Amino acid sequence: MAAAIPRAASLSPLFPLLFLLSAPQDSSGLHTKGALPLDTITFYKVIPKSKFVLVKFDTQYPYGEKQDEFKRLAENSASSDDLLVAEVGISDYGDKLNMELSEKYKLDKENYPIFYLFQDGDFENPVLYSGAVKVGAIQRWLKGHGIYLGMPGCLPAYDTLAGEFIRASGVEARQSLLKQGQDNLASVKETDKKWAEQYLKIMGKILDQGEDFPASEMTRITKLIEKNKMSDGKKEELQKSLNILTAFQKKGGEKEEL
């Protein structure tokens, strides 16, 4: 009969793994699902590996409504192959966690959270987000920079058509794209037809009123949401309308920071 192996000896190879699993998640104190915590070392390793990286700079232990909005955004990023969401926790006391990055980007802690969008590994020219810390507003801003995230009311096929419509230079080309969208309605699910028709309505308005219609309509709807008391259902419908309107903004446009 084989000699019995002492229990402690049989478990010894697992000790390092068990130690790692029982250790704190990371030194920054951040545990947001869908977001990658970065420090002064990993920041420079990770940013170049993704086409787009949205980085939130914040206190070491963020909380409250703005952090809740960020959590929703981080989870929603699962729908994008091009976008990585990350966060950097900063502390100006004790070990002065990640202060090097705070100084590099001239961050003011009174303005936390601060969002920067890095593209193609460019550390020197990130784009600052200056809108409201609301998941819908940030996603619309990202969409304006060519980053697609699944948003309520939006239909990928019609988002693509809207992009082609805005890039088209002549009236005839735009009319042709409008007709294409109308012809495609037959294949749209019944539950989505209302929103597909809204894309077509916006195309018609642009043909009639010009390029400024999407931006002015977004401003109008945003003011309605902010100032008027309305049911949650009505507010949700208006938010979907805002989401659809962003498909008609030229890539890199920043007018949607509302």
UniProtKB/Swiss-Prot annotation:
GO terms for biological process: negative regulation of gene expression; negative regulation of protein secretion; positive regulation of gene expression; positive regulation of MAPK cascade; protein secretion; regulation of endoplasmic reticulum stress-induced intrinsic apoptotic signaling pathway. Pfam families: ERp29 (PF07749), ERp29_N (PF07912). A motif (Prevents secretion from ER) lies at residues 255-258. It is found in: Endoplasmic reticulum lumen; Melanosome. SUPFAM superfamilies: ERP29 C domain-like, Thioredoxin-like. GO terms for cellular component: cell surface; endoplasmic reticulum; endoplasmic reticulum lumen; melanosome. The keyword Signal applies. Keywords: Endoplasmic reticulum, Phosphoprotein, Signal. PANTHER family: ENDOPLASMIC RETICULUM PROTEIN ERP29, ENDOPLASMIC RETICULUM RESIDENT PROTEIN 29. Homodimer. Part of a large chaperone multiprotein complex comprising DNAJB11, HSP90B1, HSPA5, HYOU, PDIA2, PDIA4, PDIA6, PPIB, SDF2L1, UGGT1 and very small amounts of ERP29, but not, or at very low levels, CALR nor CANX. Does not seem to be a disulfide isomerase. Plays an important role in the processing of secretory proteins within the ER. This is Endoplasmic reticulum resident protein 29. The lineage of its organism: Eukaryota, Metazoa, Chordata, Craniata, Vertebrata.
